[in-house]
Amino acid sequence: MKIPAFIELLKPITWFPPMWAFACGAISSGQSWSLHWNVVLIGIILTGPLVCASSQAVNDWFDRHVDAINEPQRPIPSGRIPGRWGLYLGIIWSLLSLLVSSYLGVWGFYATLIALLFSWAYSMPPIRLKQNGWFGNFACSISYEGLAWITGAALLSSTLSPSHPSLM
């Protein structure tokens, strides 16, 4: 397995929306980033290159049979990521996400756990939320945007309600 195939599996282009949502939530808290720069940095890394990336690996693993027909050039069906390594990378990246989230306290850990549960339930049989337009879209909207935004706001303000009015 080569590094370019691994990076392609994690789909960096998809990381921006949850990272942006976390940053917007942090801004909406009304708190100074200079006092909480480490929380913001860890949160942005957690939402994009870790949680979102793990969801991409998990989804590609469980879609490998369909991708073998529709998109055979992808890393798993093309064999650039051999055997069960696609699954192993999804598991490793999910566990790494939980480890990093533990540095954000209880709120950060449980928000990450919920996002990861949604990402696995979205793709993994027999649940496969993606097979239902309502449940699949709900899982994506919560784990990609909603949860990231709320977590960014909550981690900086230490509450679910901002201390200052915002234009949300």
Sequence positions of predicted segments:
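Multi-pass alpha-helical membrane architecture of UbiA-family
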Residues: 1-168
